[in-house]
A protein has these predicted regions:
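A short, surface-exposed alpha-helical micro-motif characterized by mixed small hydrophobic
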Residues: 192-194
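Helix-to-loop junction immediately C-terminal to a conserved catalytic motif
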Residues: 50
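Conserved ABC ATPase "signature" region
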Residues: 104-122
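Conserved ABC ATPase signature
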Residues: 126-130, 134
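H-loop/switch region of ABC-family ATPase nucleotide-binding domains
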Residues: 186-187
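Catalytic Walker B motif of ABC-type/P-loop ATPase nucleotide-binding domains
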Residues: 151-154
């Protein structure tokens, strides 16, 4: 289904343009991170690419498949975990049942991802009583179990302590190594250094740079991107 081609994308609310003429193309293999200051339009762009929002102008095109087929090949994890009032295991198995996976296969897939994410010992516990880091690992495990070609992540480690963040990043690395394309929003340049292959930099709804992560961090071209990398405040 890749590459993903975004052309002339705009998004407005009550005549205020939150994204303006955004264009880029993403290949199948790199981990792509969308970065920028608060209010830059990062999460909106992610939701449009996933099909949760419709653009005001422009197009989002995948290489192949109908809209339904494209959505079946994607998964998304939000900053705040969305969990059912069920056990951790049941949360994973239910997502698989919705996708039409047979019960036996769903159990086996759930076993694999719960083990890989370090959640086997607490798989029987109600999902909503888990810690914040455990809940976020669970929603990542649930998404991974779907075997997405593309996994969208909206600041999955926001507000977590360093140990929980490291666990989340380990899962992201595993999902990437298993073959999923990662498209992730973050404000954390440390995460960019540790995980990203490619960076899209947004500022005030405009895409100012698309570059390899090392080039972006060391040699950002725009004044705004350089200021962001240096830790200056942007608005």
């Amino acid at each position: 289904m890749l590459p993903l081609v975004v052309d002339g994308l705009g998004f407005s609310v009550r005549e205020q343009w939150l994204l303006k003429d955004v264009s880029f193309s993403l290949g199948a293999h790199d981990r792509t991170f969308i970065v920028g200051p608060n209010g830059a339009g990062k999460s909106i762009l992610l939701k449009i690419c996933h099909g949760l929002l419709s653009p005001t102008t422009g197009t989002v095109r995948w290489a192949s498949g109908s809209f339904r087929e494209q959505r079946q090949r994607q998964a998304m994890v939000f900053q705040k975990p969305v969990l059912l009032r069920r056990s951790a295991r049941a949360n994973v198995e239910y997502a698989l049942s919705v996708r039409g996976v047979a019960k036996k296969d769903a159990r086996e897939r759930a076993d694999r991802v719960l083990e890989a994410t370090g959640l086997t010992a607490i798989a029987h516990r109600p999902a909503r009583v888990l810690s914040g880091g455990e809940q976020q690992r669970l929603v990542l495990a649930r998404a991974w179990a779907l075997r997405p070609q593309v996994l969208f992540l909206d600041e999955p480690a926001a507000h977590l302590d360093p140990a929980a963040t490291a666990a989340i990043e380990d899962v992201i690395q595993q999902v990437s190594n298993a073959g999923s394309k990662i498209i992730m929003v973050t404000h954390d340049l440390g995460q960019v250094r540790r995980l990203a292959d490619e960076v899209l930099f947004l500022h005030q709804g405009q895409l100012l740079e698309q570059a390899a992560s090392g080039d972006f961090l060391a040699h950002a071209k725009s004044q705004e991107a350089r200021a962001f990398v240096e830790g200056q405040l942007l608005w």
